[in-house]
């Protein structure tokens, strides 16, 4: 059995090679993305694993079919970068890694919240200037006194809710699919609007859909409790970014922790040090004084990276051997 891996970073290569040695499977790695040009490198291979970031070119699906390759294993939970209908038309199974480390994202969410409510960024800036004074700009809030709204109560949302509950927060939530596990931790509300209206902190953990694209916009921000904090560790497209910046400037929101940006594809995960960022909206977001922006790094732990690599490769092997897998999404 031979597998081709695309978009492989150095640290992932080490893990993939160990997995291959442990399982007696031949693999070929490339840092290059999967494109109509590079897909030709998969000729003669049995399966593909890929860490796709932006939309996959539609021309790739029929090319894979011609090669006899029947799947693409994505190294993430989200698969919005794939045309699932076109994949199905070409007998290509797309798989994901649905649960690689919910705790990694949950812990990161709470880390950023604590930084925001205790003004850690400002304190560090002051200290570098040898300003050691106390005053209102750095006076913080107690997390346990806050009401938290979790929007999206799947694995990650639930893990996040549990941590906030452990701090003593009142936790409410909304999801179109309510779970018994979440009901033990939070109080479900019947709508997003009802969940957010009294929340000091709103934390987003839902998958991207056509229905929730730009759901968090100027109209919804007006329904927030004045001075609330917004956290987005989900997908960038659920927020209308300019409306978020306007809400921060107007004082409707007091802060935001943003790990994903709708148009991050050209920038993440790349080093742009010393280069010009031409996306003016992205520049405004990352430089806003009330925003802590992180480059889609909430998931990024040893455990998560290992689980993503191995999860994608295991799914590839399972499809080759059996024709299907439990992690298929089409």
From Swiss-Prot:
Enzyme Commission number(s) of this protein: 1.1.1.28
InterPro entries named in the record: D-isomer_2_OHA_DH_cat_dom (IPR006139), D-isomer_DH_CS (IPR029753), D-isomer_DH_CS1 (IPR029752), D-isomer_DH_NAD-bd (IPR006140), NAD(P)-bd_dom_sf (IPR036291)
SUPFAM superfamilies named among the record's database cross-references: Formate/glycerate dehydrogenase catalytic domain-like, NAD(P)-binding Rossmann-fold domains
Keyword Ribonucleoprotein: no
Active site: 235, 264, 296 (proton donor)
Binding site residues for NAD(+): 155-156, 175, 206-207, 212, 233-235, 259
GO molecular function: D-lactate dehydrogenase activity; NAD binding
Pfam family, one: 2-Hacid_dh_C
CDD domains in UniProt: LDH
Enzyme class: oxidoreductase
Top-level taxon: Bacteria
Entry keyword annotation includes Cytoplasm: no
Reaction(s) catalysed (UniProt annotation): (R)-lactate + NAD(+) = pyruvate + NADH + H(+)
PANTHER family: 2-HYDROXYACID DEHYDROGENASE HOMOLOG 1-RELATED (PTHR43026:SF1)
Family membership: Belongs to the D-isomer specific 2-hydroxyacid dehydrogenase family.
Annotated protein name in UniProt: D-lactate dehydrogenase
Species in which this protein is naturally found: Streptococcus pyogenes serotype M1
């Amino acid at each position: 059995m031979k597998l081709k891996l695309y978009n492989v970073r150095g640290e992932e290569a080490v893990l993939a090679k160990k997995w291959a040695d442990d399982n007696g499977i031949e693999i070929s790695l490339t840092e290059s993305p999967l494109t109509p040009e590079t897909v030709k490198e998969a000729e003669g291979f049995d399966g593909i694993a890929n860490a796709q970031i932006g939309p996959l070119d539609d021309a790739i699906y029929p090319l894979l079919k011609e090669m006899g390759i029947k799947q693409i294993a994505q190294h993430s939970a989200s698969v919005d970068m794939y045309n699932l209908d076109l994949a199905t038309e070409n007998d290509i199974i797309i798989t994901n890694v649905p649960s690689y480390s919910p705790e990694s994202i949950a812990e990161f969410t709470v880390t950023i919240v604590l930084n925001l409510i205790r003004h850690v960024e400002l304190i560090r800036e002051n200290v570098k200037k040898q300003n050691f004074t106390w005053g209102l700009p750095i006076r913080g809030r107690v997390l346990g006194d806050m009401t938290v709204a979790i929007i999206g109560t799947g694995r990650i949302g639930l893990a996040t809710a549990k941590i906030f509950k452990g701090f003593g927060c009142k936790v409410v939530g909304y999801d179109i699919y309510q779970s018994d596990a979440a009901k033990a931790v939070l109080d479900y509300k019947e709508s997003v609007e009802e969940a957010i209206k009294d929340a000091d902190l709103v934390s987003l953990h839902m998958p991207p859909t056509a229905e929730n694209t730009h759901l968090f916009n100027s109209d919804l921000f007006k329904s927030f409790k004045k001075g609330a904090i917004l956290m987005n560790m989900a997908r960038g497209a659920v927020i209308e970014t300019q409306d978020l910046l306007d809400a921060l400037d107007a004082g409707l929101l007091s802060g935001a922790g943003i790990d994903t940006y709708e148009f991050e594809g050209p920038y993440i995960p790349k080093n742009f040090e010393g280069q010009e960022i031409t996306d003016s909206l992205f520049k405004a977001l990352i430089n806003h004084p009330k925003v802590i922006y992180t480059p889609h790094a909430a998931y990024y732990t040893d455990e998560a990276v290992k689980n993503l690599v191995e999860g994608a490769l295991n799914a590839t092997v399972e499809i080759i051997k059996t024709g299907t897998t439990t992690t298929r999404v089409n």
